Design a protein with these regions (language model features):
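Proteolytic maturation boundary segments
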Residues: 1-36, 44, 48
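Scaffold signal of the M16-like zinc-metallopeptidase fold and its non-catalytic homologs
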Residues: 1-7, 76, 119, 151-192
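Buried hydrophobic packing residues in well-ordered domains
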Residues: 31, 49, 67-69, 89, ...
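M16/MPP (pitrilysin/insulinase) zinc-metallopeptidase core fold and M16-derived inactive scaffolds
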Residues: 41, 46-113, 153, 176-177
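Hydrophobic face of alpha-helices
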Residues: 66, 82, 86, 120, ...
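Sec/Tat-exported extracytoplasmic proteins
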Residues: 69-77, 93-96, 127-134, 148, ...
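M16/insulysin-pitrilysin zinc metalloprotease superfamily fold
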Residues: 75-79, 110-143
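Short, flexible active-site-proximal loops enriched in glycine and acidic residues
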Residues: 94-102, 116, 132-138, 158
Length: 193
């Protein structure tokens, strides 16, 4: 016998007050939009750069290329290879993230506030001076192909892809899988990334 009466929902606790901080907006001299949200209790800074270069901007034969490009960004820059980049980030306690969606690619870095200048320099290096070494592009391509093959055996992924195909008009990027197809990804070259 259980001590809990599962026929009755548990009593909820008091709702805690949360005052979301004001978002300040501005623009950098180069035209980039700037949004700042300060949480003074945390000594952490997160910088998120959003590029309007997503999967939705690609023609059908190049499906999945934006995702592959985003995933390969962490593979190195013109100044350092992927291992050196990872070591530089780890050395300052920073975390780099890249995420590609339909509308754009987000490149972000999170770090303690006193290490922001170094982290920001690394973010700029990754964004402005990517190298896309062939070995890294090949590795990411193989990972993406494995994901595509795995999705072909996943009923949930197949259902989602079918809903998208039926919901969106033929030829729209949203009607195809965001990660691409085996034929579109297997033919991607380093020069196309």
């Amino acid at each position: 016998m259980s001590l809990l009466d599962r026929t009755q929902p548990p009593a909820s606790g008091e709702i805690r007050q949360f005052d979301f901080p004001e978002v300040q907006t501005g623009a950098l001299p180069n035209g980039l939009d700037l949004k700042i949200c300060v949480l003074p209790r945390l000594p952490i800074v997160s910088v998120n750069l959003f590029l309007r270069a997503g999967e939705g901007s690609l023609v059908e034969g190049r499906a999945g290329t934006a995702v592959l490009t985003g995933d390969a960004l962490e593979g190195g820059t013109l100044k350092r290879n992927g291992s050196s980049l990872a070591e530089a980030l780890e050395g300052i306690g920073a975390r780099l993230g890249v995420s590609t969606g339909w509308e754009g690619t987000s490149i972000s870095v999170s770090v303690l506030a006193d290490r922001l200048p170094e982290a920001f320099a690394l973010l700029a290096e990754v964004t402005l001076e990517p190298d896309f070494p062939s070995v890294e592009v090949d590795r990411v391509r193989e990972q993406q192909l494995a994901e595509i093959r795995q999705r072909s055996m996943d009923p949930s992924a197949l259902a989602s892809d079918e809903v998208s195909r039926r919901f969106y008009a033929e030829g729209l990027p949203y009607a195809r899988p965001q990660v691409g197809t085996e034929s579109s990804i297997s033919s991607v070259t380093r020069d196309q990334v």
